[in-house]
């Protein structure tokens, strides 16, 4: 089966969950015996994207003459030329994100990551484009059952064209972090030696609810005393970062809030391993990859009780209303104060995380493409 995977390789810089999904599926499609893969991208400019693109071995590679964002903008205005002009004949064009890509004969598969986010936060023009993308797709790949429900509620004509293909955690998150990696974590983060910390892994976006997370954790006596740090892995726009810095400053001079940006992948594994817990009060999640990564590394998870997170965390989570600072504080307080229950849920979390491996997700993707030819 001839499959063309279309994605923007410049997104390799500070990869979000969507990009991690795209690259993980791409790399496994390249090894799938039933797939003849071509990888197609717009002009690659960022050094991180160029490094990935040049190192990609196995599949045929096609780089278009315009940046991905520019050619997608052109295709929105005029669905021509078809992507087969560059790729040659294809059975499927697979988009790991919500892209509109015109084809000559190939069927189109697009991935839906977070319909509710689009409905709640995107402007009307983008929502109209999403409807067009779903209306013209032959197959829609949905990353969670919650997202599928939202998709079919908003776009009922998609019924019969949706397949479940979840996100996952990379295999190395299921392996213990090396002792030397763990030993360097606090020094690399700029934390005092031996200090425990709560962890957040999320882009600095309003829907991730990080300012409320800071205010809620600042109510913990250990945090205000400087005996428990809070580490926010992520990055974002200057305005959102300013809001978070101001919220952290309001917690008092002894509180320790650390915002180190995005570390390399193996360093992130060690950061998870050393954390006391992951706190993830996101207002809107179509999946929630950090919850799986944390459970795979054997740390407890305090999760929002809404959108897809209860589906992903199952019985392993300490759940809270993400709009209520008192509820977030209480969930973390309970997690900290119940060592026996914490150990029980950590064991549950490891078992739950095993369901979310990329080889399983890739098998579901390949089967969906085969079933919908």
Where are these regions (language model features)?
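Carbohydrate transferase catalytic cores enriched for Leloir-type hexosyltransferases
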Residues: 1-373
């Amino acid at each position: 089966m001839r499959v063309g995977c279309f994605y923007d390789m410049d997104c390799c810089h500070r990869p979000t969950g969507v990009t991690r999904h795209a690259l993980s599926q791409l790399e496994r499609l390249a090894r799938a015996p039933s797939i003849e893969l071509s990888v197609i991208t717009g002009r690659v400019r960022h050094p991180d994207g160029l490094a990935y693109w040049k190192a990609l071995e196995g599949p045929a590679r096609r780089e278009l003459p315009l940046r991905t964002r520019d050619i997608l903008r052109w295709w929105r205005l005029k669905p021509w030329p078809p992507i087969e002009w560059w790729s040659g004949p294809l059975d499927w064009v697979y988009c790991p994100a919500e892209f509109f890509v015109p084809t000559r004969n190939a069927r189109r598969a697009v991935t839906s990551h977070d319909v509710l986010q689009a409905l709640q936060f995107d402007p009307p023009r983008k929502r109209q484009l999403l409807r067009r993308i779903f209306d013209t797709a032959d197959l829609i790949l949905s990353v969670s059952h919650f997202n599928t429900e939202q998709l079919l509620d908003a776009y009922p004509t998609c019924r019969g064209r949706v397949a479940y293909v979840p996100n996952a955690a990379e295999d190395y998150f299921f392996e213990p972090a090396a002792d030397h990696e763990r030993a360097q974590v606090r020094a690399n983060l700029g934390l005092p030696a031996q200090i425990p910390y709560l962890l957040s892994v999320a882009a600095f976006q309003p829907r991730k609810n990080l300012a409320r997370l800071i205010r809620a954790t600042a109510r913990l006596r250990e945090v205000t005393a400087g005996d428990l740090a809070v580490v926010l892995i992520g990055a974002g726009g200057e305005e959102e970062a300013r809001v978070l810095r101001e919220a952290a400053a309001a917690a008092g001079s002894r509180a320790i809030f650390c915002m180190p940006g995005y570390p390399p992948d193996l360093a992130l594994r060690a950061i998870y391993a050393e954390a006391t817990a992951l706190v993830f009060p996101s207002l809107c999640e179509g999946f929630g990859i950090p919850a799986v990564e944390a459970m795979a590394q054997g740390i407890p998870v305090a999760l929002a009780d809404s959108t897809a997170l209860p589906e992903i965390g199952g019985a392993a989570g300490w759940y809270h209303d993400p709009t209520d600072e008192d509820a977030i504080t209480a969930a973390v307080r309970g997690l900290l104060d119940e060592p026996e229950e914490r150990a029980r849920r950590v064991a549950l979390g490891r078992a739950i995380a095993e369901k979310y491996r990329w080889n399983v997700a890739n098998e579901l993707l390949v089967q969906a493409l085969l079933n919908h030819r």
